[in-house]
């Protein structure tokens, strides 16, 4: 039966990876005005003899990369990330996967505009920003950031870094250094991405100087992304030790990768020096509208698990350490780390340096921060060909405006029960935060009610508001009527006394008593216009106006009252005063 450990291992093999996000799934799959399109290209600097059976584009030098990507740049794409499939490290046996790289290009589309006005043209530039004898020096990162910032002040947009180590010993795979001129004589099939799924075109490169950006196109048979119909893009330096969008700044790791690949192909450099490492940086240079950018490093602790000298795991609380920077408008660009400081114990911590682009003043007016997705992807390879990776996920999220910012390779490599190799890669994506109204709408369970039910609920709320308003108005009207009736009742008592003194008939007394304290009516209490008019004149003027204006009833009692002499009227006045 077994203890079940093998079952757990098989489940891990099949699992594509963990996904973390600052949003829930319905919000992740909410479309915005912006969408993206990706192109992928895999390449290597290893020769066909050193890496047989690989469909990756073969480059003689890292300096060939701008020329290789020139056509995609002309179509509006620009380099977004560059990384090796496996992070090189000196603590385990090297693998050819350390020397296969992927370059990822991105193109932005604005749905609200018919033309791609936001796709400003770029030119890919490479620069050697540092040459160090001791790359593990603590001054490495500050100097590295300083060089990046100097270039950014000139309008360049930082993409990634490639450390390249030079050894005095030539690579075992090639007997002598390969110059750029000789490297172009190698048979290489080029595949230039076209159409929706970057198809490749076979071309024979010329023998021009590949050190210049627009020079030669180095090519290879078919993309490893054949099953997906897309051209994977990856990056690698002139020596296999190069690191891409995420890399380990380790001299031992870099030197280790030199065993087997071609030696330094850069014709402009002198004989390689022992222990020397050059750090190449990649920049996108805008053709127009250059703006100054600001970059800053963030140190994040990485938890490294080791099985002897082999790295078996690399984890971190990604969002816990990064969410605050995302909310403030920071855009992750690149990540580097060094495993040399890890203790020999089974578990240890090492610092990863993550480089963010600070939000500019003009963008801060429109961008209120970013949401993020972090994917711990297990990429499966059969030999040197990719079987499962993050490409389908990127393409599906591109429709919702998610932008790839960084891919961090790791030295974690496992062999599956089927003989395939899986390696862990950390993929970072960002998107501007959704408007608060959209977030609030998503947070309510409005999907439980149909449109008709929602309409009925709204109508009931409206009726409730109207009923309350009508009730309040009715209460106010009733109160006003009671006040008026009480005043009329007082006047009715007065008139009744006058009528009794003047010998008014019993018929007049009935209506007076019945209408006392009630609303005034034309046929009730106030029927004797003459008598009541004269009598009320001795009281308040307001009573006089009210009674005279409303009394339009029977006239006979009034005429009887007027038949009395003047003395009776005076007596009535005296009685009323009393």
Curated annotation (Swiss-Prot):
<comment type="subunit">
    <text>Interacts with TLR4; the interaction occurs in response to lipopolysaccharide stimulation. Interacts with CLTC; the interaction occurs in response to pathogens. Interacts with AP2A1 and AP2B1.</text>
</comment>
<feature type="compositionally biased region" description="Basic and acidic residues">
    <location>
        <begin position="506"/>
        <end position="518"/>
    </location>
</feature>
<keyword id="KW-1003">Cell membrane</keyword>
<dbReference type="InterPro" id="IPR028169">
    <property type="entry name" value="Raftlin"/>
</dbReference>
<dbReference type="GO" id="GO:0032740">
    <property type="term" value="P:positive regulation of interleukin-17 production"/>
</dbReference>
<dbReference type="GO" id="GO:0032596">
    <property type="term" value="P:protein transport into membrane raft"/>
</dbReference>
<dbReference type="GO" id="GO:0050852">
    <property type="term" value="P:T cell receptor signaling pathway"/>
</dbReference>
<dbReference type="GO" id="GO:0003725">
    <property type="term" value="F:double-stranded RNA binding"/>
</dbReference>
<keyword id="KW-0963">Cytoplasm</keyword>
<dbReference type="GO" id="GO:0045121">
    <property type="term" value="C:membrane raft"/>
</dbReference>
<feature type="compositionally biased region" description="Basic and acidic residues">
    <location>
        <begin position="467"/>
        <end position="485"/>
    </location>
</feature>
<dbReference type="GO" id="GO:0040010">
    <property type="term" value="P:positive regulation of growth rate"/>
</dbReference>
<dbReference type="GO" id="GO:0032991">
    <property type="term" value="C:protein-containing complex"/>
</dbReference>
<feature type="region of interest" description="Disordered">
    <location>
        <begin position="169"/>
        <end position="271"/>
    </location>
</feature>
<dbReference type="GO" id="GO:0002457">
    <property type="term" value="P:T cell antigen processing and presentation"/>
</dbReference>
<keyword id="KW-0597">Phosphoprotein</keyword>
<feature type="modified residue" description="Phosphoserine">
    <location>
        <position position="220"/>
    </location>
</feature>
<feature type="modified residue" description="Phosphoserine">
    <location>
        <position position="199"/>
    </location>
</feature>
<feature type="lipid moiety-binding region" description="S-palmitoyl cysteine">
    <location>
        <position position="3"/>
    </location>
</feature>
<dbReference type="GO" id="GO:0001765">
    <property type="term" value="P:membrane raft assembly"/>
</dbReference>
<keyword id="KW-0472">Membrane</keyword>
<dbReference type="GO" id="GO:0005769">
    <property type="term" value="C:early endosome"/>
</dbReference>
<protein>
    <recommendedName>
        <fullName>Raftlin</fullName>
    </recommendedName>
</protein>
<feature type="region of interest" description="Disordered">
    <location>
        <begin position="551"/>
        <end position="578"/>
    </location>
</feature>
<feature type="compositionally biased region" description="Basic and acidic residues">
    <location>
        <begin position="557"/>
        <end position="578"/>
    </location>
</feature>
<feature type="compositionally biased region" description="Basic and acidic residues">
    <location>
        <begin position="185"/>
        <end position="206"/>
    </location>
</feature>
<dbReference type="GO" id="GO:0050853">
    <property type="term" value="P:B cell receptor signaling pathway"/>
</dbReference>
<dbReference type="GO" id="GO:0005886">
    <property type="term" value="C:plasma membrane"/>
</dbReference>
<keyword id="KW-0519">Myristate</keyword>
<comment type="function">
    <text>Involved in protein trafficking via association with clathrin and AP2 complex. Upon bacterial lipopolysaccharide stimulation, mediates internalization of TLR4 to endosomes in dendritic cells and macrophages; and internalization of poly(I:C) to TLR3-positive endosomes in myeloid dendritic cells and epithelial cells; resulting in activation of TICAM1-mediated signaling and subsequent IFNB1 production. Involved in T-cell antigen receptor-mediated signaling by regulating tyrosine kinase LCK localization, T-cell dependent antibody production and cytokine secretion.</text>
</comment>
<keyword id="KW-0449">Lipoprotein</keyword>
<dbReference type="GO" id="GO:0034138">
    <property type="term" value="P:toll-like receptor 3 signaling pathway"/>
</dbReference>
<feature type="lipid moiety-binding region" description="N-myristoyl glycine">
    <location>
        <position position="2"/>
    </location>
</feature>
<feature type="compositionally biased region" description="Basic residues">
    <location>
        <begin position="457"/>
        <end position="466"/>
    </location>
</feature>
<keyword id="KW-0967">Endosome</keyword>
<dbReference type="GO" id="GO:1903044">
    <property type="term" value="P:protein localization to membrane raft"/>
</dbReference>
<dbReference type="GO" id="GO:0033227">
    <property type="term" value="P:dsRNA transport"/>
</dbReference>
<feature type="compositionally biased region" description="Polar residues">
    <location>
        <begin position="169"/>
        <end position="184"/>
    </location>
</feature>
<keyword id="KW-0564">Palmitate</keyword>
<feature type="modified residue" description="Phosphoserine">
    <location>
        <position position="183"/>
    </location>
</feature>
<dbReference type="GO" id="GO:0043330">
    <property type="term" value="P:response to exogenous dsRNA"/>
</dbReference>
<comment type="similarity">
    <text>Belongs to the raftlin family.</text>
</comment>
């Amino acid at each position: 039966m077994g203890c079940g450990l093998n079952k757990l291992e098989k489940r891990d093999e099949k699992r594509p990876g963990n996904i973390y996000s600052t949003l829930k799934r319905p919000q992740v799959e909410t479309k915005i005005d912006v969408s993206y399109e990706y192109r992928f290209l895999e390449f290597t600097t290893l020769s066909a003899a050193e890496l047989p059976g690989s469909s990756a584009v073969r480059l003689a030098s890292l300096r060939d990369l701008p020329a290789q990507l020139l056509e995609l740049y002309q179509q509006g794409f620009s380099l977004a990330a560059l990384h090796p499939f496996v992070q090189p490290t000196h603590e385990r046996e090297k693998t050819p996967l350390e020397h296969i790289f992927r370059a990822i290009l991105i193109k932005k589309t604005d749905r609200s505009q018919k033309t791609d006005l936001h796709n400003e043209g770029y030119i890919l530039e490479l620069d050697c920003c540092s040459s160090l004898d001791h790359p593990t020096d603590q001054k490495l990162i500050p100097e590295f950031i300083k060089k990046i910032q100097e270039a950014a002040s000139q309008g360049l947009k930082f993409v990634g870094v490639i450390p390249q180590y030079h050894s005095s010993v030539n690579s075992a795979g090639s007997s002598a250094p390969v110059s750029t001129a000789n490297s172009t004589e190698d048979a290489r099939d080029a595949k230039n991405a076209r159409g929706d799924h970057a198809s490749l075109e076979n071309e024979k490169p010329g023998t021009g100087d590949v050190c210049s950006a627009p020079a030669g196109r180095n090519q290879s048979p078919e993309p490893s992304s054949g099953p997906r119909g897309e051209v994977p893009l990856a990056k690698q330096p002139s020596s296999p030790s190069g690191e891409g969008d995420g890399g380990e700044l380790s001299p031992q790791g870099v030197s280790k990768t030199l065993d087997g690949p071609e030696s330094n192909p850069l014709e402009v450099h002198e004989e390689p020096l022992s222990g020397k490492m050059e750090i190449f940086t990649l920049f996108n240079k805008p053709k127009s509208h250059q703006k100054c950018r600001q970059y800053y490093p963030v140190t994040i602790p990485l938890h490294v698990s080791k099985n002897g000298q082999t790295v078996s795991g690399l984890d971190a609380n990604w969002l816990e350490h990064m969410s605050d920077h995302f909310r403030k408008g920071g855009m992750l660009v690149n990540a580097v780390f060094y495993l040399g400081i890890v203790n020999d114990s089974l578990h240890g911590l090492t610092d990863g340096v993550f480089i963010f682009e600070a939000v500019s003043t003009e963008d801060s007016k429109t961008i209120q921060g970013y949401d993020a997705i972090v994917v711990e992807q297990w990429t499966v390879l059969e030999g040197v060909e990719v079987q499962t990776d993050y490409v389908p996920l990127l393409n599906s999220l591109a429709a919702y405006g998610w932008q790839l910012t960084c891919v961090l390779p790791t030295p974690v490599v496992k062999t599956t029960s089927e003989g395939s190799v899986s390696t862990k890669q950390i993929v970072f994506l960002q998107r501007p935060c959704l408007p608060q109204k959209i977030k609030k709408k998503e947070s309510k369970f409005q999907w439980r009610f149909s449109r008709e039910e929602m309409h009925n609920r709204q109508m009931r709320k409206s009726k409730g508001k109207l009923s309350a308003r009508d009730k309040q108005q009715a209460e106010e009207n009733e109160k006003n009527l009671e006040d008026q009736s009480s005043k009329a009742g007082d006047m009715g008592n007065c008139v009744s006394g006058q009528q009794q003194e003047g010998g008014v008939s019993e018929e007049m007394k009935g209506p007076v008593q019945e209408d006392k304290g009630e609303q005034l009516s034309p046929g009730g209490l106030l029927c004797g216009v003459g008598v009541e008019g004269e009598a009320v004149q001795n009281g308040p003027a307001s009573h006089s106006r009210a009674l005279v204006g409303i009394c339009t009833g029977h006239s006979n009692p009034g005429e009887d009252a007027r038949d009395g002499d003047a003395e009776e009227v005076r007596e009535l006045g005296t009685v009323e005063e009393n």
